[in-house]
Amino acid sequence: MAMPDVSLRQLLEAGVHFGHNTRRWNPRMAPFLFGVRNQVHIIDLQQTVPMLERALREIRNVTAGGGRVLFVGTKRAAAEHVAYAAKRCGQYYVNHRWLGGMLTNWKTITNSIRKLRQMEETLAGDGQGLTKKEMLNLMRERDKLDRALGGIKEMGGLPDILFIIDTNKEKLAVEEANKLGIPVVAVLDSNSNPEGVTYPIPGNDDAIRAITLYCDLVANAVLDGISAEMAASGADIGALEELPAEAVDEDAEAHA
């Protein structure tokens, strides 16, 4: 598996160049804007291509070194695609709501994950000793915790890099990563604030096709990094590729 190529045509077809109405913009994004068309800011894709490639290389390098990638996108347009991409490459995600302290108070989050596991074990054992009402309440509580923490349940520690869709909505995630010195890769629309983003990717962060493209490219970069790590350790790359293929099939069925 090779690093994914990024072409200008790919980005154009996905609508990556369309920013927001000129009334809704952040002046800090001015260096990344090409101009205005029909009162809509147009993002300079000549800059996006190399910046996207740089971000993908960094993600690839992180996973080649055995690092963890956390995908973050909680708005409706991104949530499903973020989860699907993270699962496809064996990484982690937050797609429901960013809980305060998710990174900076990891110990408390770990306790909540432990609580989630205990609930799952109880329910897997048919909830012996519980009344029907207690079972229903436990299931509701489990579902609520799983929506918030299910995507990081297996992470086992802090991530080594974040990939974020919409930094305006995920401002808290950026701030927490900055406090801990965790690098941030993020898509920045014309109304975004680039502050605190280590590897910015100027582009539309609302269009489904654009979001899907970013997520696919990042997932492929992760898989390329994992392949490189396995090759360096002398592991069987064929075995590595077989496992994700099965996982992809399962996810694709659920995604359909």
Curated annotation (Swiss-Prot):
UniProt GO BP: translation
Coiled coil: none
One term of GO molecular function: structural constituent of ribosome
Domain of life: Bacteria
Keyword tRNA processing found: no
Transmembrane segments: none
Cellular compartments per GO CC: cytosolic small ribosomal subunit
Alphabetized InterPro entries for the sequence: Ribosomal_uS2 (IPR001865), Ribosomal_uS2_bac/mit/plastid (IPR005706), Ribosomal_uS2_CS (IPR018130), Ribosomal_uS2_flav_dom_sf (IPR023591)
Keywords: Ribonucleoprotein, Ribosomal protein
Family in the record: Belongs to the universal ribosomal protein uS2 family.
PANTHER family tied to this protein: 30S RIBOSOMAL PROTEIN S2 PROKARYOTIC AND ORGANELLAR, SMALL RIBOSOMAL SUBUNIT PROTEIN US2M
Record protein name field: Small ribosomal subunit protein uS2
Organism listed in the record: Acidiphilium cryptum (strain JF-5)
